[in-house]
Every structure is written in structure tokens, then in C-alpha cells.
Amino acid sequence: ELLRHGTNLLLTDPRRMGKTFWMRNFASQEAGFRCYFIDYEGVFTVHNFLINTADALIKERKLPERALTKLKTIFDNCDLEISPGPITLKTYHHQTSPHVLLTNVLTALDDDEDDAIPVVMMDEVPMAINNIADREGASAAEEVLQTLRALRQKTARVRWIVTGSVGFHHTLKKTNMTQGVLNDLESLRFGPLSNEEAKELAHRLLLGVGQDPNEAIIDK
């Protein structure tokens, strides 16, 4: 209901597991939303952040035609069936600020005229911001968070969910940023997983490591 009414969410629960599971579960079950899950684990530069964003949107294979057309003006290899290789920035955009391009990529979702509400699910953002600060400096990291905040203010239809296994407070302190870059997000704490959620998570984890997810093991 929060998302339907225009609230953007910051998943702040301290537990390391469950937030990503919740987002993927939400995306698969909730009608009326078109969800785009973006994982920023392993991102160390603003350019990486941009590429990860665009790549995830394209691979979802449910981008509205207008948004995909916009991405094709920025990147090569956007047609997965024709160009299976990684997307790359077009030559004439090599000198364009990646923060500007990030804005162009994500605002394209706001042009969707479908009834479904677009939801951008950004996972492991604190880790990426921390890595960018280490690699490119605190100002580059801060500009990413400022860009994302401006996007949340600018877009009318898009909803945003931001989370990560590393707390934002450590990242903000390290880069001398204030909570102001996040204060437009509503903090949502999960608390413990329900019994059914815990079983479903255990089931998926066992499948992920090639184990038989039988009930006896899961119940333990």
C-alpha cells in the first residue's frame, strides 16, 4: 500500500538475509507493479553503477518500447536476441557525465503509459557507494546518492526501493554525507521472518547449493 500511494522505501532491517528475498518475492507476486531488480554488488565506479543499472533494465525483457528506445540512444548491444554481448556506452557519450546518463536511463521508466506502476528495486547500494568512495573519492559517491535522490523527486510514476546488506550509516559517515540524501525514503523494518517465509527462504537456499530441499531438512 505504501508503494501504491507514492511512498519510496528504504529497507533498513539489520538482518543480512531476507531483504533481497522479499523484493524478489514481491516482484513475482504483486499485481499492478512492473518491478526492475538491480543488484549493485561488485560495483566500484560510477560507470559500473550506470552499466549495472542499464543492463538490469534491459535483461528484465519487460521494458516499455519507449524506454528501450531511449536506452538505445545511450548504449550499444541493447537487443539481446541480436547482440548477446555486454552493453557498452556509445562513443559519443564517452565524455558525458555518468550521473547525467544515469538520470536519463532511469527517467525513461517514468514515460511508461502502462497501468502497471514501475518499481526500481536497488539492492546492495550502500556497498556500491562505499566502493565508489574508495575508488573514485567521496565526492563521486555523494553525487550518485544526490542523483538518486533527485530522481526520486523528479519522477512521478516510478517507485523506489533501496536496500543492502551493509548499513547506510557506515557509508554516510565514511563519506561525510548527511542523512539528507536518504530522508525522502520511508524506513521499513521487517523484523523476524514468518515461519512460511523462513521455510521458503531455506528452500531456495538449498536449491541454490544443489541440495534436496526436503521438508525434514527445512523444518530443522
Residues covered by each model-derived region:
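Sensor-1/coupling segment of RecA-like P-loop NTPase cores
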Residues: 118, 127-128, 137-176
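A short helix-turn-beta junction within AAA+ P-loop NTPase domains corresponding to the substrate/partner-engaging
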Residues: 175-191
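P-loop NTPase nucleotide-binding core
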Residues: 5-135, 158
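C-terminal alpha-helical "lid" subdomain
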Residues: 103, 115-119, 210-211, 215, ...
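Conserved small helical "lid"/interfacial subdomain of P-loop NTPases
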Residues: 189-218
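Flexible, glycine- and charge-enriched loops at secondary-structure boundaries
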Residues: 95, 137-141, 195
